[in-house]
Amino acid sequence: EGRTLKSGGAWVYDNEIDRVEGDYENGDILAVKDFDGFFLGWGFINTRSKITIRVMSRRKEHEITEEFLEKRVRNAWEYRKATVDTGCCRLIFGEADWLPGLVVDKFSDVLVVESLALGIDRLKPTILSLVKKVLAEDGIMIRGIYERSDAKVRLQEGMERFKGFILSLIHI
C-alpha cells in the first residue's frame, strides 16, 4: 500500500507491501505501485531488509540507467559546489540525493564510500566511475577510494562487511 511513500518518504517497509508481481532478485529495481496500480516510483527491493524498497525516483519516465545515475551524481556535485566548501564535503548523501543507502565523502582527492543497501551496492561501481568523471570535468583527479562499508546493517541486507581501499594511486 506504500503509506510511507505516499506521505513523502523514500522507503517502503515490509508491512506496507501487499504483493510483488513478476520474478525478481533482491537488489533488482522495480516499478512501485499502489493497490490501484498507480505508479509511485522506481526502487530497489530487498526482502531481507525491514526497509524492503528504497525509492530512487518518483517519476515514471526515469528508468534507472547510467544516464539517470550520471544526472543524480552531477546534481549532487552541483548542489555541493553552490552550498559548501568542496575541498572536504559529503558529496553524496543517500536519500537526500536520491541514491538511497550510499554515502560518498570527498577529502581533497580521496573519496570515502559507505554502501548500506544491496541495490545501491550493485550500482556502486558505476556510480563511483561517474563521480570520478564528473569531478574530472572540474579538474579534480581522484587518487584513492576507501570503502568503509562495515556497518552491521549490511549483514541484514545480505552483504558482507568490508573496509579498505578499492582504488589506490597513493603510496602508503
Sequence positions of predicted segments:
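N-terminal auxiliary segments of SAM/dcSAM-dependent transferases
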Residues: 85-97, 105-168
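Conserved small/polar residues in nucleotide/adenosyl-binding loops
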Residues: 170-172
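Non-catalytic accessory regions of SAM-dependent methyltransferases
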Residues: 1-108, 137, 163-166
